[in-house]
Design a protein with these regions (language model features):
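Extended ligand-binding regions for polar small-molecule ligands
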Residues: 14, 62-71, 130-132, 151-153, ...
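Bilobed "Venus flytrap"/periplasmic-binding protein-like clamshell domains
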Residues: 39-42, 55-70, 125-173, 192-194
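C-terminal motif of bacterial Sec signal peptides marking the signal peptidase cleavage site
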Residues: 8-12
Length: 274
């Protein structure tokens, strides 16, 4: 009876080891890391024409994702969709990771798990037309104005709390840029780095920030809730390495070098309603 029990125990343990080994093999068998983003948010993620005229992905987050894939020894596959759908698609298994200048807020932590931060983002900035910039000396000057922000972002929540504001929510930052450039909204609110990028590439826009908009935020990589593929340890190792190598500054410089190309791509087209 004792011998039978021992044999059963050993068999059960062996089966468990085999199962764990199989799970480890499955993780190790990953050959492609699928990266989800919303490529309309320079300098983090955007599309631009390469030397052959083909549209390709560029930006800080794109380079971080490639660095992580290289560290893991796998290929990177980029998938583009609207920002508001990214975390839902992530949990449906459409992506392995999401990078889109995402702050790991408490609300988002309910929908996904997050890596260690790889970048600190300046406080949000308003973008307004240069000819109107003198109207906005204080945060209170935005009360009662029509202000746009990207759908499902913390910026939309911020503008919704401004007294008597008419908040406009759009999926695309490029559409927001057109709205403020054409005077269809008084201002838009975006992340600090994004505002600075568009100010540099659009002569008619000015970036403004105020203490009421808060302080800096930490930007992280998102994985599906519970990290079912066990990706976070390797991702955090890669982030530690790129931080040690000061790669973010290199990636920022690379994005800035594309400013002229980006200006041609992102500049609003003239239309009859302008």
């Amino acid at each position: 009876m004792i011998m039978t029990l021992c044999i059963f125990t050993l068999t059960a343990c062996g089966g468990s080891d085999d199962a764990n080994a199989g799970a480890d093999t499955e993780k190790e068998a990953m050959t492609t890391l699928v990266f989800g983003t919303s490529a309309d948010y320079a300098p983090f993620e955007f599309m631009y024409p390469d030397e052959n005229g083909d549209m390709v992905y560029g930006g800080i987050d794109v380079e971080v994702a490639q660095y992580i894939a290289d560290y893991m020894g796998v290929k990177l596959q980029t998938e583009n969709m609207s920002f508001s759908n990214l975390l839902t698609a992530l949990n449906k298994g459409q992506f392995d990771i999401v990078l889109a200048d995402i702050e790991a807020t408490d609300e988002r932590k309910e929908a996904a798990d997050f890596s260690d931060p790889y970048l600190t983002e300046p406080a949000p900035h308003f973008l307004v037309k240069k000819e109107n910039a003198d109207q906005y000396k204080t945060y209170a000057d935005f009360e009662g104005k029509t202000i746009g922000a990207q759908t499902a972002t913390t910026k939309l929540k911020i503008i919704s709390e401004i007294p008597n504001v008419n908040a406009v929510s759009l999926q695309s930052v490029l559409d927001l840029i057109k709205e403020v450039s054409y005077g269809k909204v008084d201002a838009i609110l975006v992340d600090g780095s994004v505002a600075q990028q568009y100010q540099e590439t659009n002569d008619d826009l000015v970036a403004l920030t105020f203490d009421e908009l808060g302080s800096s935020a930490e930007v992280c990589v998102a994985v599906a809730k519970g990290d079912p593929k066990g990706l976070l340890p390797k991702i955090n190792e890669a982030i530690a390495k790129l931080t040690e190598e000061n790669k973010i500054e290199e990636f920022k410089a690379n994005a800035a070098a594309l400013a002229d190309v980006l200006q041609e791509v992102s500049a609003p087209e003239e239309d009859s309603e302008a």
